Amino acid sequence: MISVSGAVKRMWLLLAIVVVAVVGGLGIYRLHSIFGVHEQPTVMVKPDFDVPLFNPKRVTYEVFGPAKTAKIAYLDPDARVHRLDSVSLPWSVTVETTLPAVSVNLMAQSNADVISCRIIVNGAVKDERSETSPRALTSCQVSSG
């Protein structure tokens, strides 16, 4: 059988923590009532306004050259990869985005000795490259256009 004094010896630390917590809680409660924290605060909130969208960006990808067809892969403004095989040249596609910045990429390869690519953002040519080699491969890239 466990004696009462043995139980007190084992539980004194837990008992001390409980007493300190209760005394501290009562003290904080009294301070809150003295400084009026229990009153409901008045908060003035401005009406919610819609965040204006960024000016839309029109991104145009173009591939051209003497070949009749080409393999094309491009990364759109939403970071989705599009792969197209045997596309008739000249080729172009335009996408629109409201992202504040665009990072796009275009790669093209043909069976001819020359191929060119171009990326246009809002009417301005941001990158244009041409490659001359057997089975020509070229790429264009725009970051934060």
Swiss-Prot record:
The keyword Zinc does not apply. It is a single-pass membrane protein. This is Probable transport accessory protein MmpS2. Belongs to the MmpS family. It comes from Mycobacterium tuberculosis (strain ATCC 25618 / H37Rv). Induction: Transcriptionally regulated by MmpR5. InterPro entries: MmpS, MmpS_C. The chain crosses the membrane at residues 11-31.
